[in-house]
Amino acid sequence: MESTAPVPATAPPVAATPPSVAATGLVKSFGSVSAVRGVDLTVAQGEIVAFLGPNGAGKTTTIDMLLGLSHPDRGTVEVFGESPRAAIAHGLVSAVLQTGGLLKDISVRETLQLTASLFADTRPIDEVLARAGIAEIADRKVGVCSGGQQQRLRFAMALLSDPGLLILDEPTTGMDVEGRRAFWNAIRADAARGRTVLFATHYLDEADEYADRIVLMSRGRIVADGTTAEIKNLVSGRVVHATLPGADQVALAALPSVDSVEAKGERVALHTRDSDAVARYLLTQTAARDVEITAQNLESVFLALTGNDNDDTEEARS
């Protein structure tokens, strides 16, 4: 009797890992004011994304929808494949917001203990105190903590549920330079273990240094989305820097291809579409020295892409 080779069993399909954030066609208005106008945003697990835009661009309104604090008029949003509120209830999402949410008359440790009681399972209190850099003030009343210390307490509270997604809205407000550095070192360490981070900030240097990806909003829409290098390349031109005592800014601004001139002490910076020609002029026609050519910085790109972002957008919500 002829034998038949066994047919190998077909392996069950592997379920695709849902993105941390999947927002499609988000629209939100407040009366006659259009705050968000058709935002599409997908954030993969493990990304660190800077969410930038001037006041009134729609960032905070978008973040509110990602957190389930408000509902879009149109469009859909999912967090790890669930509704935002379900994801938060399951401890998958935490947020560090700018203000509010702290009881002034209890200690830092008591605040964390109270917050931990809301979850079935949390990281140890001492662990999140250390991670947030506030172990030494654990017994201090919240009301006597500085603004930066209170912000780090909010960070510790957000870490309790060990969330897969951490949303930060101006997280380093009130922190000094050293506090900001320590905070971002902690964020980077957590992200290295796979946590997704989405943060809004007005400190463009933070976005430049710590983000894998930058999403830029203007007038309720996403106008740019990419790596820092990709975003910088969206604006043409270079910046020519030089030391030029007594520089005639009017004459420099009148040079062909020069868009603007900035001066700080003896240093000048010329934003130009023809950096070679400008550098040649400075070296041959002036007493300039220490001439260097650089790409546009993130601030220049930010201003170029957002422009005067204050018409027909949200006024009270940034």
Segment roles from a protein language model:
Residues M1-V27, N308-S318:
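ABC-family P-loop ATPase nucleotide-binding domain
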Residues V14-A15, L103, A116, L270, ...:
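A general boundary/transition motif marking the beginning of the first structured unit of a protein
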Residues P18-A23, K28-F199, L204-S218, A224:
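ABC transporter nucleotide-binding domains
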Residues F30, A116-A120, A132, V235, ...:
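A broad structural signal for alpha-helix termini and local helix breaks/kinks
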Residues R213, V235-G237:
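Short, flexible active-site loops
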Residues A229-L234:
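Short acidic-hydrophobic catalytic motif
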Residues G237-D312, S318:
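Short, charged/small-residue-rich alpha-helical element at the C-terminal edge
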